[in-house]
Amino acid sequence: MPRTPPYPEIVADLGALLGLSRPAGQCFAAIWRAARPPCADDLTAGLGLSRSNVSTALKELRDWGLIARARAPGDRKDYFTAPANPWEIVRLLLSGRQRRTIA
Protein backbone atom coordinates (compact mmCIF):
# COMPACT_ATOMS: atom_id res chain seq x y z
CA MET A 1 0.00 0.00 0.00
CA PRO A 2 1.49 3.41 -0.96
CA ARG A 3 2.38 5.76 1.87
CA THR A 4 0.14 8.84 2.20
CA PRO A 5 2.14 12.08 1.89
CA PRO A 6 2.24 14.34 4.95
CA TYR A 7 -0.64 16.80 5.31
CA PRO A 8 1.45 19.96 4.64
CA GLU A 9 2.61 18.45 1.33
CA ILE A 10 -0.97 17.70 0.25
CA VAL A 11 -2.08 21.25 1.08
CA ALA A 12 1.00 22.64 -0.70
CA ASP A 13 0.03 20.71 -3.86
CA LEU A 14 -3.57 21.93 -3.68
CA GLY A 15 -2.46 25.50 -3.03
CA ALA A 16 -0.09 25.34 -6.01
CA LEU A 17 -3.04 24.46 -8.24
CA LEU A 18 -4.72 27.70 -7.14
CA GLY A 19 -1.63 29.88 -7.42
CA LEU A 20 -0.04 29.70 -3.97
CA SER A 21 3.64 28.84 -3.66
CA ARG A 22 4.50 25.45 -2.16
CA PRO A 23 6.05 26.99 0.99
CA ALA A 24 2.89 29.09 1.47
CA GLY A 25 0.78 25.93 1.25
CA GLN A 26 2.99 24.15 3.76
CA CYS A 27 2.90 27.10 6.17
CA PHE A 28 -0.87 27.40 5.85
CA ALA A 29 -1.34 23.70 6.63
CA ALA A 30 0.86 24.00 9.72
CA ILE A 31 -0.93 27.15 10.93
CA TRP A 32 -4.41 25.73 10.32
CA ARG A 33 -3.72 22.47 12.15
CA ALA A 34 -1.72 23.95 15.03
CA ALA A 35 -3.15 23.59 18.54
CA ARG A 36 -1.87 27.10 19.35
CA PRO A 37 -0.91 29.86 16.92
CA PRO A 38 2.67 29.31 15.72
CA CYS A 39 5.31 31.99 15.20
CA ALA A 40 7.69 32.10 12.22
CA ASP A 41 10.38 30.30 14.23
CA ASP A 42 7.96 27.44 14.96
CA LEU A 43 7.16 27.12 11.25
CA THR A 44 10.84 27.22 10.27
CA ALA A 45 11.71 24.44 12.72
CA GLY A 46 8.61 22.33 12.09
CA LEU A 47 8.62 22.43 8.30
CA GLY A 48 12.36 22.47 7.66
CA LEU A 49 12.07 25.61 5.51
CA SER A 50 14.51 28.51 5.57
CA ARG A 51 13.58 31.63 7.52
CA SER A 52 13.37 33.64 4.28
CA ASN A 53 11.04 31.05 2.69
CA VAL A 54 8.77 31.19 5.74
CA SER A 55 8.79 34.99 5.80
CA THR A 56 7.91 35.20 2.10
CA ALA A 57 5.21 32.53 2.49
CA LEU A 58 3.64 34.36 5.45
CA LYS A 59 3.51 37.60 3.47
CA GLU A 60 1.87 35.75 0.58
CA LEU A 61 -0.71 34.19 2.91
CA ARG A 62 -1.49 37.58 4.47
CA ASP A 63 -1.90 39.08 0.99
CA TRP A 64 -4.41 36.34 0.15
CA GLY A 65 -6.23 36.99 3.44
CA LEU A 66 -5.67 33.40 4.56
CA ILE A 67 -3.90 34.20 7.84
CA ALA A 68 -3.95 36.95 10.43
CA ARG A 69 -1.29 38.13 12.84
CA ALA A 70 -1.88 37.79 16.56
CA ARG A 71 0.18 38.95 19.50
CA ALA A 72 0.58 37.29 22.87
CA PRO A 73 0.60 39.65 25.86
CA GLY A 74 4.18 40.45 26.87
CA ASP A 75 5.67 38.81 23.75
CA ARG A 76 7.14 40.69 20.80
CA LYS A 77 6.77 37.82 18.34
CA ASP A 78 4.00 37.67 15.77
CA TYR A 79 1.85 34.55 15.91
CA PHE A 80 -0.40 33.47 13.07
CA THR A 81 -3.96 32.21 12.92
CA ALA A 82 -6.12 30.90 10.09
CA PRO A 83 -9.91 30.77 9.74
CA ALA A 84 -11.36 27.69 11.42
CA ASN A 85 -14.20 27.34 8.89
CA PRO A 86 -13.09 25.31 5.83
CA TRP A 87 -15.70 27.02 3.64
CA GLU A 88 -14.23 30.42 4.52
CA ILE A 89 -10.82 29.11 3.45
CA VAL A 90 -12.24 27.90 0.12
CA ARG A 91 -13.90 31.29 -0.41
CA LEU A 92 -10.63 33.12 0.31
CA LEU A 93 -8.66 30.83 -2.01
CA LEU A 94 -11.11 31.24 -4.87
CA SER A 95 -11.38 35.02 -4.46
CA GLY A 96 -7.58 35.29 -4.31
CA ARG A 97 -7.27 33.19 -7.44
CA GLN A 98 -9.87 35.35 -9.19
CA ARG A 99 -8.06 38.58 -8.21
CA ARG A 100 -4.80 37.27 -9.62
CA THR A 101 -6.42 36.01 -12.82
CA ILE A 102 -8.12 39.33 -13.53
CA ALA A 103 -5.12 41.51 -12.61
Question: What is each stretch, according to the model?
Answer:
Residues 52:
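Key DNA-contact positions within bacterial/archaeal DNA-binding proteins
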Residues 65:
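Glycine-centered, phosphate/nucleic-acid-interacting loop/turn motifs that mediate DNA/RNA or nucleotide
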Residues 3-17:
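Short, Lys/Arg-enriched N-terminal segment that forms or immediately precedes the first helix
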